[in-house]
């Protein structure tokens, strides 16, 4: 990851800004986020607004992309309510279903979610959001005020891209993606990876199917990455927990080759994600999915 990011630095107009961000990311082992106080410091030093700074950093966000199919690298930055930046990038997985793909806006928002962000105010992206992503972003409580910023056009409300939008309220749902959630699932274990998967299943946003699942990925150096299921009112833009967890791992500067264990805990109701998850795990790593049904 460090080499991919290093190659993008020349795309940032100010080389002083590029070097400042390089040193920050290097110090945090290339975790793809910037705390609000770091954003404030960079904005002050380089005389930029948070939105202007994010636009300049999009090449770095896009460096986290995995696009073996399209070779089309999209970068996004979700800005949290206190001003933190959460990078995101499109993730494609060859030799499996195209539905396993993660879009850059989904990546940035789910990355924010796994870092316990509770509200997104702005999404900055290097290409116009596709319809899939517009619908995904409409699952946020902040959707009516959410601003989209592109290199060629800034300060656009999400609903200017999604007029007469269909969303959670149309299905009488008042609970939104990123809202605190406890699905009250229980499982007796002292295993920290299983406990993390259970915690993620309890945090899943699935008000439509009420089918909850969570993923925990353990690496060879004992890091644990999290993924909760993010359901959508339009169903198809929903994001499975495995993709959320893989995204969390990659945006944390880690690698697929470092994975040694994947645990999935699921309370299936109208839906079951087990086989979809097993297919992607078998495609990516030489380990079985550790699946627990509640």
UniProtKB/Swiss-Prot annotation:
EC number(s) stated in the UniProt entry for this protein: 3.5.4.5
Cofactor(s) the record lists: Zn(2+)
Annotated catalytic residues: 105 (proton donor)
Enzyme class: hydrolase
Function as written in the Swiss-Prot or TrEMBL entry: This enzyme scavenges exogenous and endogenous cytidine and 2'-deoxycytidine for UMP synthesis.
Identification of the protein by name: Cytidine deaminase
Keyword field: Hydrolase, Metal-binding, Zinc
Reaction(s) the record says it catalyses: cytidine + H2O + H(+) = uridine + NH4(+); 2'-deoxycytidine + H2O + H(+) = 2'-deoxyuridine + NH4(+)
Native species: Pasteurella multocida (strain Pm70)
Residue numbers binding Zn(2+): 103, 130, 133
Coiled-coil region list: none
UniProt xrefs under HAMAP family: Cyt_deam (MF_01558)
GO MF entries: cytidine deaminase activity; identical protein binding; zinc ion binding
PROSITE patterns: CYT_DCMP_DEAMINASES_1 (PS00903), CYT_DCMP_DEAMINASES_2 (PS51747)
GO cellular component term of the entry, any: cytosol
Cofactor note: Binds 1 zinc ion.
């Amino acid at each position: 990851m460090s080499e991919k990011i290093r190659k993008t630095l020349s795309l940032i107009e100010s080389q002083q800004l590029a070097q400042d961000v390089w040193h920050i990311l290097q110090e945090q082992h290339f975790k793809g986020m910037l705390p609000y106080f770091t954003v404030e410091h960079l904005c002050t030093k380089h005389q930029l607004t948070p939105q202007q700074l994010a636009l300049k950093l999009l090449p770095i966000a896009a460096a986290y992309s995995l696009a073996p199919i399209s070779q089309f690298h999209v970068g996004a930055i979700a800005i949290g309510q206190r001003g933190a930046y959460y990078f995101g990038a499109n993730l494609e997985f060859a030799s499996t279903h195209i539905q396993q793909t993660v879009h850059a806006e989904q990546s940035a928002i789910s990355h924010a979610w796994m870092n316990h962000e509770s509200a997104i105010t702005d999404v900055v992206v290097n290409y116009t959001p596709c319809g899939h992503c517009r619908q995904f972003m409409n699952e946020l409580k902040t959707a009516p005020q959410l601003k989209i910023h592109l290199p060629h056009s800034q300060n656009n409300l999400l609903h200017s891209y999604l007029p007469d939008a269909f969303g959670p309220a149309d299905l009488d749902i008042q609970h939104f993606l990123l809202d605190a959630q406890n699905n009250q699932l229980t499982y007796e274990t002292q295993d920290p990876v299983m406990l993390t998967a259970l915690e993620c299943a309890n945090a899943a946003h699935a008000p439509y199917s009420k089918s909850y699942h969570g993923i925990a990925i353990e690496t060879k150096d004992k890091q644990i990455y999290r993924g909760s299921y993010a359901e959508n009112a339009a169903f198809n833009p929903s994001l499975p927990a495995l993709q959320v967890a893989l995204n969390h791992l990659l945006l944390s500067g880690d690698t697929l080759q470092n994975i040694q264990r994947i645990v999935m805990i699921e309370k299936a109701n109208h839906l079951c994600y087990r086989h979809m998850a097993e297919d992607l795990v078998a495609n990516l790593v030489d380990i079985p999915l550790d699946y627990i049904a509640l």
